[in-house]
Amino acid sequence: MLRDRNEGMSTIPGFSQIQFEGFCRFLDQGLTEELHKFPKIEDTDQEIEFQLFVETYQLAEPLIKEKDAIYESLTYSSELYVPAGLIWKNGRDMQEQTVFIGNIPLMNSLGTSIVNGIYRIVINQILQSPGIYYRSELDHNGISVYTGTIISDWGGRSELEIDRKARIWARVSRKQKISILVLSSAMGSNLREILDNVCYPEIFLSFLNDKDRKKIGSKENAILEFYQQFACVGGDPVFSESLCKELQKKFFQQRCELGRIGRRNMNQRLNLNIPQNNTFLLPRDVLAAADHLIGMKFGMGTLDDMNHLKNKRIRSVADLLQDQFGLALVRLENAIRGTISGAIKHKLIPTPQNLVTSTPLTTTFESFFGLHPLSQVLDRTNPLTQIVHGRKSSYLGPGGVTGRTASFRIRDIHPSHYGRICPIDTSEGINVGLIGSLAIHAKIGFWGSIETPFYEISEKSKEAQIVYLPPSRDEYSMVAAGNSLALNRGIQEEQVVPARYRQEFLTIAWEKIHLRSIFPFQYFSIGASLIPFIEHNDANRALMSSNMQRQAVPLFRSEKCIVGTGLERQVALDSGVSAIAEHEGKILYTDTDKIVLSANGDTISIPLVMYQRSNKNTCMHQKPQVQRNKCIKKGQILADGAATVGGELALGKNVLVAYMPWEGYNSEDAVLISERMVYEDIFTSFHIRKYEIQTHVTSQGPERITNEIPHLEAHLLRNLDRNGIVRLGSWIETGDILVGKLTPQTAKESSYAPEDRLLRAILGVQVSTAKETCLKLPIGGRGRVIDVRWIQKKGGSSYNPETIRVYISQKREIKVGDKVAGRHGNKGIISKILARQDMPYLQDGTPIDMVFNPLGVPSRMNVGQIFECSLGLAGDLLDRHYRIAPFDERYEQEASRKLVFPELYEASKQTSNPWVFEPEYPGKSRIFDGRTGDPFEQPVIIGKSYILKLIHQVDDKIHGRSSGHYALVTQQPLRGRAKQGGQRVGEMEVWALEGFGVAHISQEMLTYKSDHIRARQEVLGTTIIGGTIPNPEDAPESFRLLVRELRSLALELNHFLISDKNFQINRKEA
């Protein structure tokens, strides 16, 4: 962000800035802080001392490039070197060497890390800030009970309670509580100090009897009493050093370490002036907290809102990496201690390099990036997805809440979220409200709070100044909602404006305003800020749109939206998918692979990304946008990336849509489309799949890659080269061999052919046998081979196998079953692809491209799609693009309608087409049935909407099962496409079958095709030879399972078969 106190703000901050700032803070401060905590290590006899000289540590440049790290499944990291010294105390000699501590994964230009060849990103966690919080609850008698909760930096909680007799207790566990006097004495205070440091000494003395005086008579007695209550120990424990250490480890360290943020919060809440470097809970803190609790009892002071953002802190990538680095150093310390004692025991002479191993640091970071819940695989479906993923905030994770235990209050929108956390963009399902997205201007401050910018309005100066404020600062200020004129501060404001004050939204005179917002969508996330006319949509549909834009597939030919919000350029810029000129110069050469330019007398070659696979199998590709011998400026777009056009985000296509029913093919959110979408590659996308195979060294010998595979038909091997690997550029069909591999195995004597046995008997020749373990193309994987990688790791053992990866590109046109969506939560499945001559057509003969159901608009309340549709038609006819800020109704009533209708009227005049804007029903038009040529009865809304093709495609979801695996317990088919599972016939499906009276089909579904073991085998046999399917005589396995489960509850259940002959009842045993 360009920020100046005089000039204001000219650009929005970089969307990846939070990740960059966090990682830089870890390198600048976190590394040094943790290294300074590393202690001097001595042996048991105190003859040798090891220490690190942390002031001159070095981080080396990475040995490999990012691209190579991805292809070879390596970690893009930097080596950490620290000078270390080994001091011999007897001779006072010191040996100093620079030791290699380990590898630290680095952050690339996208704000992500590459670990084992995979893009990983660390998302921000929202935790309860350490400090003290007061709240009030009603007991069973309806009386208010006040409690104060002290939260430590580790997340441990201790509660202070005040009962009816004004006695104060500290709850040390769920069942046990002790007097506040005992706790203060155990922490080192005597009775005189306690009474001198409290505001209500008479209350403390009122509940102090002789027994309590004895307990707090000395520190030892207080510690013993505290230990007895805390550990629930009976008898008379004896004071000892080990008892103090146990208390220190189990209670004080977990519940009394406040950290720098907790110390600051405690000082502010309790009006203390304890030094900032004193990060542990002191007796003064406890006594001041008790004073405030007594004040609450007498109606003084204010209660705390636990869900206010001022009471939350952000655990950013810097904090998480610093914690892991500290953990790695603790492990390194233990390893060095063990190595020193082992060297002295065996009378060896150690050196600093021999003592230090890089394993603790490297394995700690790899396990963190691979296993930690807040370290996630970067979603790279499209450029927007990459940007949004790094700006997520989560209440989940270690120290946080869980999806099942989180209350509604935590999930709900809070007034303090204004400008900090988007009120719209969150996940759907069990994690709703727990995973959010930061607003576009939000940043993380030094104290872990989310800050947002405001214009500060002062009476002395007419110029408004930009200030970043945490949630605690703007709570008691009157904040005017930013309007569209916020960047133009010279314009006179209205006399009365809507404002926010103390978590309430009021209407206040302009003279009383202290702060004002700076941007119309300052309080929205990136995804929500890309929705035009969002103010006309229901928030639930805007939420769906924010999520679905992240699921859009980059198309073969991208297209800019006609109606946008203006943020499309910055999203594309910050995503890093476009190639940007870093210097001004002249283009010397350009092709699909690279761009060569001359700048400042130097020749610079810029490689372009070609057909790179994302982890969602979408195609990332860069296309040059500059021509040879042209001069360029710094910051100019050299090449567009996936889903960008001219440096702007382009996720979908502008297509001609109509809102009308059509023969029921668009009922229930189905969508009818024209065959033009297929034949002209309007919604065609490329997808790249990766197939890999490894070679191991088995006990029978090494596996071989070869093209000589016995017992396989020649046409399956037609695409292999002489090495046994598929050729580049080959067209591959299902079942073809991609990599030929043979695995050696030992065969039994009976399995040899007669000629092999003869050779063994006469000549003693050992005939080797091998099993074919080739890599074959699975079902649905046809396409073109675009890349083959043979990665040979050092060693060649079974622990370092060779890996062969084959990348296959698929061209996917849109088809029935694919999912499409607009930017207003209007989603649907393609139900039918109609010939263009049968589609409804306009009065100028243009056929409609897509037909949506009009009933999907009023009940969903996403009317923004209608405004976009009409304005898009005007923009298409006038060859204009519109960038509209949200909430334009603040200018005047019906501002959106007054924007759209004049544009439609102008388009009607310029194109001489009066049907574009008809005053009787503006925005609608008479259209004709393509099959009969007759006009439809009612005028229809037609226009150009921006439609996205989502990653939920029928090719990835369609699945059929003839036979497969069964669950061991229920004997029913497994669940899921990946397991070749069956289709579930649930309760509602059985009702539907019953409704049509199809008894035999229902019986087949529930018995033969499911869990009737004997019957399903007989069905298979009769189906092959042709015959009648026999009736089953026993119960299916699920019924037998139910009977056994009831028997375990001592309930006997039998079933009987009633024969129609002689009406005999035969009891059957389950």
UniProtKB/Swiss-Prot annotation:
Protein name: DNA-directed RNA polymerase subunit beta
A cellular component term, taken from the record's GO annotations: mitochondrion
PROSITE patterns on file: RNA_POL_BETA (PS01166)
Reactions catalysed, as given in the entry: RNA(n) + a ribonucleoside 5'-triphosphate = RNA(n+1) + diphosphate
Biological processes annotated in GO: DNA-templated transcription
Family affiliation: Belongs to the RNA polymerase beta chain family.
SUPFAM superfamilies, A to Z: beta and beta-prime subunits of DNA dependent RNA-polymerase
Subcellular locations according to the entry: Plastid, Chloroplast
Lineage: superkingdom: Eukaryota
Gene name of the record: rpoB
HAMAP family associated with the record: RNApol_bact_RpoB
Main location: plastid
